Amino acid sequence: MFLPSTTNHSSAPLQKHLCLFCTFWALLFGSHGDNSVQEDFAESMLLFFADAEGYFAACTTDTTMNSSLSEPLYVPVKFHDLPSEKPESTNIDTEKTPKKSRVRFSNIMEIRQLPSSHALEAKLSRMSYPVKEQESILKTVGKLTATQVAKISFFFCFVWFLANLSYQEALSDTQVAIVNILSSTSGLFTLILAAVFPSNSGDRFTLSKLLAVILSIGGVVLVNLSGSEKSAGRNTIGSIWSLAGAMLYAVYIVMIKRKVDREDKLDIPMFFGFVGLFNLLLLWPGFFLLHYTGFEDFEFPNKVVLMCIIINGLIGTVLSEFLWLWGCFLTSSLIGTLALSLTIPLSIIADMCMQKVQFSWLFFAGAIPVFFSFFIVTLLCHYNNWDPVMVGIRRIFAFICRKHRIQRVPEDSEQCESLISMHSVSQEDGAS
């Protein structure tokens, strides 16, 4: 980085050179002109360069430049383009040829450094530190502040609360199997919303992703049919609550990924901390509203219920939501949504291992598509929205609609005609 020096020099050497310069031009014009012209020219030149000297002196003593730049460092220059020493045979020839005048440069260069606050990009591009330190600086620069995280949490706390409320209300009104089946449609809502409001290139809608989501929903249906118990208390309101919860979960994950594009920009524990704080401050009047309207009686829980609430809140809400949101940022919103459907066959497998519960073949027929669809979507997102189903359909369509080539049929001997050669015709004409 070559910058001019900003140190204050005395003006005497500059004035001396200016006087010599003006005298030279005066003598030059003196041989062809009048002495008055010489004196006027010398005075005008002195005034011009005096003003220029004052201008450059003001620029070099600029306080802003001195405050932003570091102290000058003088380093000797190494000219790499100098010709190497030639052999003795060539020296004899060069002595005979006259030497040409060369432009000479200073052997010392002045280097000054900008502070990191003024040139962060330049510092990052020229860093010689380990990669970890560079990543930490990038994360610090691009991280959202506490105020920005609080604004995002304030918007999403209501969506998060309504999604959990819908799911719990569906469990209280409908069978668990119906709730799980309808909640698995969250993957379909996520696929559609992510295509309408994409956060990155991995949210593009493809036919392969749609078939994978349908495969996951079909697997969840078979799994729940294998362990469902027939009961007459099916309620349509519970199904509506399940669909509402699935849609709200899709809105929640798609919109938060659109607001925050990278996982290192958002402090996830701070985000959920603000969500819990806003729910505590804004939604506590709902206890008295539900109590006095008669929808639900408000009573303080006993020790067992309170312990279950605390454990469920720490593991089932805080830890699971944290890991789930982090995984959605690292992969995609669709992968995170389909991962929730894996809890159904995994919980049934845990019952089989711990409580020795027996299930029919429908469970195994439904668990395989659920796992298979999850890995299919993972591969499709990994390979840059690869759509093998659409590629296969296009190839089949091109094969069916291709133009048939006209093949030549072997001709019969009766359809062949021997043409008279020109040589025989010329001989007959000569004989005649």
UniProtKB/Swiss-Prot annotation:
It is found in: Membrane. Belongs to the SLC35F solute transporter family. Its main location: membrane. Residues 1-33 form the signal peptide. The lineage of its organism: Eukaryota, Metazoa, Chordata, Craniata, Vertebrata. The keyword Membrane applies. PANTHER family: SOLUTE CARRIER FAMILY 35 MEMBER F5, SOLUTE CARRIER FAMILY 35, MEMBER F5. The modification Phosphoserine is found at residue 116. The keyword Phosphoprotein applies. The gene is SLC35F5. It comes from the Eukaryota. Keywords: Membrane, Phosphoprotein, Signal, Transmembrane, Transmembrane helix, Transport. The chain crosses the membrane at residues 152-172, 177-197, 205-225, 236-256, 270-290, 304-324, 329-349, 361-381. Residues 161-225 form the EamA domain. This is Solute carrier family 35 member F5. Putative solute transporter. It is a multi-pass membrane protein. One of its GO terms (cellular component) is membrane. It comes from Macaca fascicularis.
